[in-house]
């Protein structure tokens, strides 16, 4: 898959956008369904996070599409420590549905 949905600091205009900008690709506005948290927990405690849920509220963000992503997943997975990379269906503002990866908060530990 050559697409990543971002909703936090990796979005254009935010503190870590340069990470994806350096990979090179195309940005499309879109949304997923889930619960957005301004601050996560565990290793992600100081950063925004999401827990996906098909009946959850709409969480807006950006779909980053790049053929170069395959060469960068290991680096991105390490950067997103505290999150799990899972598959999601993103709806673009034009109504198109696109399969992509997203970094979701890891389950809370008991």
Label each residue range with its predicted role:
Residues 1-110:
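Glycine-aromatic micro-motifs
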């Amino acid at each position: 898959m050559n697409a990543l949905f971002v909703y936090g600091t990796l979005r254009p205009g935010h503190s870590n956008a340069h990470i994806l900008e350096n990979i090179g690709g195309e940005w499309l506005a879109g949304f997923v369904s889930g619960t957005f948290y301004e601050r996560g927990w565990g290793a992600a405690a100081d950063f925004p996070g999401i827990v996906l849920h098909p009946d959850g509220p709409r969480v807006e963000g950006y779909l980053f599409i790049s053929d170069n992503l395959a060469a960068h997943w290991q680096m991105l997975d390490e950067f997103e420590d505290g999150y799990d990379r899972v598959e999601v269906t993103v709806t673009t503002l034009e109504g198109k549905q696109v399969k992509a990866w997203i970094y979701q908060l890891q389950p809370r530990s008991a």
